[in-house]
């Protein structure tokens, strides 16, 4: 019996390495790595791979197997059902924990001025599969998630979102132009531009914002409160009260407003001073925008509506506080900033005028300028408005109240809702009004607002009565009152149905706000912020979002 040719066994180890010597390597395709060496490469990486792991896990450079799943690999294609299953199976607590650990390391490296390490950690974060998942989740949970960019693309299904994760790469990345629309500016008849990126560009901005945020928080002015993690307008108002309330506090205030801040920041300044991949940043800044089917270039500014824009604006304006501290040490010069609005106190008017020129010079380098119309110097006895509140001393006592403009805006907003609600059911109207009433009252609950709440309750009642009369022009007062208002406990005239009740402004009790510690960093002072949230014992949607930032490692109790 004639035997056939023997089957050649697959080459492994040395045999495979020898087999590639003639055909692989220099001048030809890359040599194939023996399959048996794969685990060695993981356990004992060399070259750039070793450097990257050393950044993540220190000198040993060993990467636990569970972390390998966080690195983005280009796998075989999956069906929509497979992708949807992968997205729905993501453990978001672990994702947030992984990203937060890297962000914490970036913040520590910034604090220690280890800029080379900062760049390596940023690279690791922006190429992390977990960070990409989180970036996609961020943009698909925002209010504008159903507003497409110029390409008309939306990520609605779980499959869309998982597919988007694999598309987040810096290789040959090119940002699409933004879609420009104009929206009404609150309290005015004018409109302001809003630029809408595509979904993929939003996610890329969110991804790089994750790597930039620890830097922004660590290097920020201590008295900057806008677009900051766990800081609020209420913190700014409490600090302003501390600076101005005492008998010997400074009496002059420079109210500063930057003209078109987001639209005019110098691109060159950003590229030379912001620690971020310069190629990617250039793509964000130079994308241009489309309006009325025409493409316009963007030579200045960061687009309003961009995910990363608030971070870039804050980084541009940080430094004013330290500049004033150097120029005017121990001279009652206090600086408070919220986004592009700021206050500077001064003991005399002449010093306030001098400070205005110092800030003007600081802004010029960054391509910005003060608004001549809105930048004014005011005496505390005359009062001034800041962030929707009026600050004024009455016979030596500083009071903070809701400003007239803020009261006018909420009244107009309620009027617009009632105008739209001509055919709504009472339950639909109550749901719409409760959102507005509770939100406005919570914003002002920490100041002298009890009288204002009572007046607004009266205004709201009169508006509701007119609304009911328009719905039933042929019915009498008694019938209308019985139809829409009821008794609840000791209260008469409660606007309610069998299911829902309209909340009043005065239902919100005045409660003083505890100011955040000025030097606290959310990436380095985790226990402080956890204790702060536990102490408040108020679970709002905002505080739930904050808890998700810290909810890994151990449970949060006492809420």
Task: Please describe what each predicted stretch is.
Residues 185-188, 192-211, 218:
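Hydrophobic alpha-helical hairpins/lids featuring a short glycine-rich hinge
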Residues 167, 171, 181, 219-223, ...:
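Conserved polymerase palm-domain catalytic core
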Residues 286, 366-432, 436-440:
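A conserved non-catalytic segment of reverse transcriptases
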Residues 193, 297-302, 415-429, 440-452, ...:
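Short, solvent-exposed helix-loop connector elements
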């Amino acid at each position: 019996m004639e035997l056939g040719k023997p089957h050649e066994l697959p080459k492994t180890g040395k045999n495979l390495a020898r087999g590639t010597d003639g055909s692989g390597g220099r001048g030809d395709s890359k040599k194939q790595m023996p399959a048996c060496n794969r685990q060695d490469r993981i356990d004992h990486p060399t070259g750039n791979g070793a450097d990257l792991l050393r950044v993540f896990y220190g000198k040993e450079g060993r990467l636990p197997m569970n972390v390998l799943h966080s690195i983005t690999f280009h796998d075989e294609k999956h069906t929509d059902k497979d992708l949807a299953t992968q997205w729905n199976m993501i453990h978001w607590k672990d994702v947030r924990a992984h990203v937060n650990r890297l962000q914490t390391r970036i913040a520590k490296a910034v604090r220690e001025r280890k800029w080379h390490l900062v760049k390596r950690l940023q690279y690791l974060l922006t190429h992390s599969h977990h960070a990409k998942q989180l970036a996609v989740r961020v943009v698909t949970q925002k209010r504008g998630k159903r507003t497409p960019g110029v390409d008309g693309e939306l990520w609605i299904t779980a499959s869309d979102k998982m597919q988007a994760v694999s598309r987040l790469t810096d290789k040959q990345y090119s940002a699409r132009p933004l879609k420009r629309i104009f929206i009404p500016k609150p309290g005015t008849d004018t409109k302001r531009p809003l630029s809408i990126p595509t979904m993929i560009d939003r996610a890329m901005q969110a991804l790089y914002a994750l790597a930039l945020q620890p830097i922004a928080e660590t290097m920020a002015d201590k008295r900057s409160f806008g677009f900051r993690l766990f800081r609020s307008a209420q913190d700014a108002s409490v600090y302003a009260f501390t600076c101005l309330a005492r008998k010997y506090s400074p009496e002059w205030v420079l109210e500063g407003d930057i003209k078109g801040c987001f639209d005019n920041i110098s691109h060159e300044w950003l590229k030379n001073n912001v620690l971020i991949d310069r190629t990617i940043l250039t793509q964000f800044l130079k994308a241009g925008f489309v309006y009325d089917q025409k493409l316009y270039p963007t030579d200045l500014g960061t687009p309003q509506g961009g995910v990363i824009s608030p971070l870039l604006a804050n980084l541009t304006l940080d430094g004013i506080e330290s500049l004033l501290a150097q120029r005017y040490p121990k001279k009652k010069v206090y600086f408070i900033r919220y986004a592009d609005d700021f206050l500077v106190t001064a003991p005399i008017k002449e010093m306030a005028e001098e400070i205005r020129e110092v800030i003007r010079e600081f802004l010029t380098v960054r391509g910005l300028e003060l608004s001549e119309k809105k930048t004014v110097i005011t005496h505390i006895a005359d009062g001034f408005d800041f962030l929707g509140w009026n600050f004024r001393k009455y016979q030596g006592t500083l009071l903070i109240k809701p400003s007239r403009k803020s009261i006018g805006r909420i009244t107009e907003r309620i009027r617009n809702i009632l105008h739209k609600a001509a055919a709504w059911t009472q339950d639909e109207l109550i749901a719409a009004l409760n959102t507005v009433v509770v939100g406005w009252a919570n914003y002002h609950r920490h100041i002298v607002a009890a009288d204002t709440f009572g007046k607004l309750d009266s205004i709201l009642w009169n508006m509701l009565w007119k609304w009911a009369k328009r719905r039933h022009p042929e019915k009498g007062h008694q019938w209308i009152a019985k139809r829409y208002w009821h008794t609840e406990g000791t209260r008469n005239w409660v606007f309610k149905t069998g299911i829902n009740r309209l909340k009043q402004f005065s239902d919100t009790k005045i409660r003083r706000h505890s100011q955040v510690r000025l030097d606290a960093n959310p990436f380095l002072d985790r226990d402080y912020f956890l204790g702060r949230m536990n102490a408040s014992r108020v679970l709002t949607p905002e505080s739930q979002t904050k808890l998700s930032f810290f909810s890994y490692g151990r449970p949060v109790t006492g809420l």
